[in-house]
């Protein structure tokens, strides 16, 4: 808070961080931005489909989210939410036919259909939502994913020999956990895991500390986690 003064106009933060897999207290952060007269912009790439996203309740100025990650929508689908006071102030870098149309919502008119973009993945989002609801995603599937990742968490932590990133359970997203890597050269870790063990694991080396992230989806099982652990033992 000591770093924020009147010169700060925009505060941006993730709902769930990609590298460290931390679930942020976004309502508190939005209120913090408001109290300092700053615009709040939330990177919600990993949130929709993993945690409840109530845009009215969050009340941020802007929220950008993906549907093709945890919502299981076709690749390349996402959304931009803008509070009503910003709707008619957002201009796309490439204008669409809506630029010359009359109407009150410029956000939709100017961003809705641009060039030759294939909108069929967007039209499939409704089916994704219906699929999640029909399969009781938030009440049954996600809790099972959390149970699976928590069951193996201590074992993975033991393989790394590093401390946990999670001092408070409130910061743990339901289906993601990140782990610190010990000191050393991990530049080949991702490729070796993928090519030699057929394990896809994001490895983040662009920070002072190095991380890898484990994500669990409905199709993962105990066998997958055991194979992951054996691969980590081999390459870390």
Annotate each PLM feature:
Residues 185, 191-236:
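PLP-dependent enzyme catalytic core of the Aspartate aminotransferase-like
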Residues 1-45, 49:
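Active-site phosphate-binding strand-loop segment of PLP-dependent enzymes
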Residues 108-154:
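Structural signature of PLP-dependent enzymes
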Residues 58-102:
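Active-site PLP attachment segment
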Residues 63, 162-166, 198-204:
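A short linear hydrophobic-aromatic micro-motif
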Residues 146-153, 157-196:
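Conserved PLP-binding catalytic core of the aspartate aminotransferase-like
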Residues 24-31, 35, 147, 151, ...:
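Alpha-helical scaffolding segments of alpha/beta enzyme cores, especially the outer helices
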């Amino acid at each position: 808070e000591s770093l924020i003064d009147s010169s700060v106009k925009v505060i941006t933060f993730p709902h769930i961080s990609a590298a460290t897999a931390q679930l942020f207290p976004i309502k508190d952060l939005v209120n913090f931005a408001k109290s300092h007269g700053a615009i709040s912009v939330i990177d919600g790439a990993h949130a929709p489909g993993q945690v409840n996203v109530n845009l009215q309740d969050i009340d941020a100025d802007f929220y950008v989210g993906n549907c093709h990650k945890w919502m299981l929508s076709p690749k390349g689908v996402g959304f931009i939410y803008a509070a009503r006071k910003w709707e008619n102030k957002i201009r796309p870098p490439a204008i669409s036919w809506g630029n010359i149309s009359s109407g009150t919502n410029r956000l939709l008119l100017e961003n809705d259909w641009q060039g030759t973009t294939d909108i069929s993945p967007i039209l499939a989002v409704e089916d994704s939502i219906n699929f999640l609801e029909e399969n009781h995603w938030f009440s049954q599937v996600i809790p099972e994913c959390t149970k699976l990742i928590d069951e193996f968490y201590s074992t993975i932590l033991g393989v790394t020999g590093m401390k946990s990133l999670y001092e408070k359970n409130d910061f743990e997203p339901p289906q993601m956990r990140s782990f610190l890597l010990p000191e050393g050269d991990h530049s080949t870790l991702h490729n070796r895991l993928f090519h030699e063990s057929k394990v896809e694991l994001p490895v983040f080396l662009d920070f002072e500390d190095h991380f890898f992230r484990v994500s669990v989806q409905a199709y993962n099982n105990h066998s997958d986690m055991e194979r992951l652990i054996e691969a980590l033992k081999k390459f870390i």
